[in-house]
Each structure stands twice: as structure tokens, then as C-alpha cells.
Amino acid sequence: MRITCYQCDTPTDVEVPFPVKQFVCSNCFSIYKATETGDFTFKDKYKYDKQIGGLALGLKGTLEEEEYTVTGVVVKEYMNYYWKEYVLASTTGKFLYLSEVSGHWILLREIPDDFAKGHPKIIDYNDKVFKLYDIARPRIAAAAGFFDIDLPTGLITMAELIAPPYMISFEKLEKEERTVFLGEHISKNQIKRIFKPTKELPNRIGIGLVQPYFFNVRQLALILCSVTLLILLTHLYVYHDKQEEVVFSNDISFSEYNDKEYISPAFTLNGGASPLTISVHSGVDNSWANAQVALVNEDTNEEIYANKDVEYYHGYSEGESWTEGDQSDDFSICGIGAGKYHLAITVVKAPEDLNNTGMKVTATWNKASYWNIWMLVIIMAVIVLIAYFGELYNEIKRWEDSPYTPYE
């Protein structure tokens, strides 16, 4: 349908799949009423000094597997707060509505009014609990496009209940039955993909009425708990028969193995990967000794090196005795898997230490450690707590403009 405004000569051309009762010029906001003969007569004019912007009239997009056309837009105002509502019509006579508030979009459809009368503060609908967010009486400040009704000139009573990302909206005129809409958050990027607007859409400001959190915290917690349980069960299955095993223990003489390696007998490790703990002991006395250990995989010739100093000092000064260090120490080589291995050990001591004769080296293949699992559990718990308090903060901010906020 093409209509040229009598007041400003601006043409409006949109494919309209319904009988038009009212037309509003998008340039000067002149209101025209359809006559019985199909003509349009000037009725009034909205006093609105801004451009509506947003989605242009005539844009088409596919929603719910059906093509819809933007046939009209209404600007509503309440206490100097403005928002836009777009009318979308399909060729089969279906209507959908898009509400844009501060860059946040909600897709609405009319549903049967089988709710309790009045404005209940809580509604159970489709297994969701909707809570009353606001009751307002806005007016239509401006409009543009084609409409199948006469747009109301008085105040509209609205009640909005939310269960993000959904909402239920009640609208009622003074002498008419109320209309009920079910809304769902739709992202700005989705709007762009569906309608491909040529003009930039408004940027988001604040938290939208039904804007969802970045992710579902409850689902995140369930997923992380499931992952933790799976890891724990796998760990128990792999290591259920794992026992601590001493695979090597021997005293190594400093004089016999001076400047040469001690090669241990080969040993075989079976089962899942576990840490190999190397314990060293030497009779150091105000002196030091050192052990360098190479774990050699005889199947792959892969070598893992580590070394450990053993130091023990003691004395008496300023009327008090003191000690530092120990004659024993240990260290671990983590994640050693099954296979055949041997140790190549080099031991040295302080040249001035004439009393210390050797060092005892013991290698123990330990039981699997739960340390990594507990660290993972702690990290996951921290993630869930951060997500929970982030979502809580998000909800507090969402409800801060509502007189019915549950966070006071």
C-alpha cells in the first residue's frame, strides 16, 4: 500500500497484508483514518520532535519459519521514558510485536487471557514463575506506518511480570478488554540477521528487562559437578588397585662412585601414571652433599633429570645453639607412567668433609595423588561462586528501578 501524506508530501510504501484502519506519516506524524470508500482523511497529528529511527517500515524478516513485514511502529512514553514497539505482520494474517527499550529487544506474541483477573504479583505459566516488575499507565507519544486498529489516544494500563528471558505483559484501555502478550528476549545481533536494517540500531544501555545472564548458572554448576564426578570415578577406576611400591633403595659410596654414575637395576612400573618420590639421606655434619638423578625409560630412552642438595649445619652462638637444614630430604618426579626404567645417579659431597662416606637413595612409586582433583574441585567451586554472585548482582541491577524489587 502506498500513501502520500497530505501535510508534508512524504510517500510511504509498504506491503500490508491486512485491512488498514489508520495510517501515520513517518515524517511529520500526521494521523489519517480510513473511510468506508478506502480513502484516508486527516485526523490529527502527534506532537513529537524526534526521528523514530530503528527498524524502517517495510523491512522483511523470517521469524518462526514465516516471513513478517514491519508495518508499523508505536512510540510509548511514561514519565519522560520512551520506548518503541514494532508491529510485524505475515501474509497469513499473523501478528508479532517487537519492543525495543534502551537497545534491548523483546519479541512478543498475543496469548489467551486465561489468567486471574486484576494484576497478580506472581503467575505460574509454562513451568516458569513470573514476578510483577511494574504497573504503569503510558501514552502513545508518536507512531508511524499502517495499523489495523485506531490507535488509542488515552492512557494505557500496563502490567509487566518477568521470568528472564521471558515476560508477560497485560495491556488494557479504559473501555476494552485487556490483551495479554508473552515476550522473550531477542538479541540485537539476531534482529540484524533477521531484518538486515540499513541504519544502525540503538546501543544497549544498562540491563534489559528480560536480558538473560551470560550463561545459566544452575546448568553450569550441574555440568561442573558432573565433570568432577566423572573425573573422580575415572581416577578411582584406574588407580583402585594401586599400591605404594619401593622400586629402588641402596647406599651409594662417595669414594666408589666418585666422578661416575651409579646405574640402578631395571624396574618395571605397572598401572596408571603416578609420582615417583626420590628420598635421599646422608650423614652430613656442618657440610653438604648432592644427588643428581636421571630417570631413564628403557623403551623410549627418554630421560628426566632432577637433583637435590642435602645440607645440615649447627653451632652455638650468643649463648644459644642453632641448627639449619637436615640430613634427609626428598623430591618427586610427577606423572610417571607404566614402563621399564632405571636410575642413573651421581652423588658428590663437600671436598673437606672426610667423615661422610655415602648417601642412601630410595625411589618409591607412590599411590596416585588426589591433590590435582581437589584443586580442580576448588577451581570449579570458585567459578560457580563467581558466576552465582555475578548473576545475583545482575538481578539486583535489573530490579533496582522496580517498586516490586525482591532485593530490599
Where are these regions (language model features)?
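Hydrophobic membrane-insertion alpha-helices, especially the h-region
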Residues: 220-237
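Short metal-coordination and nucleic-acid-contact micro-motifs, chiefly zinc-binding Cys/His arrays
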Residues: 1, 21
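N-terminal membrane-entry
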Residues: 218-225, 367-385
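Short, aromatic-rich amphipathic segments at membrane interfaces
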Residues: 205-214, 349-376
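Extracytoplasmic/lumenal ectodomains and periplasmic regions of secretory and membrane proteins
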Residues: 138-190, 292-353
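Short, surface-exposed polybasic-aromatic patches that bind anionic ligands, especially phosphate groups
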Residues: 3, 11, 15-16, 26, ...
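Membrane-proximal low-complexity regions enriched in glycine and acidic/polar residues
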Residues: 97-145, 244-332
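Juxtamembrane interface at the cytosolic side of transmembrane helices
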Residues: 213, 382-408
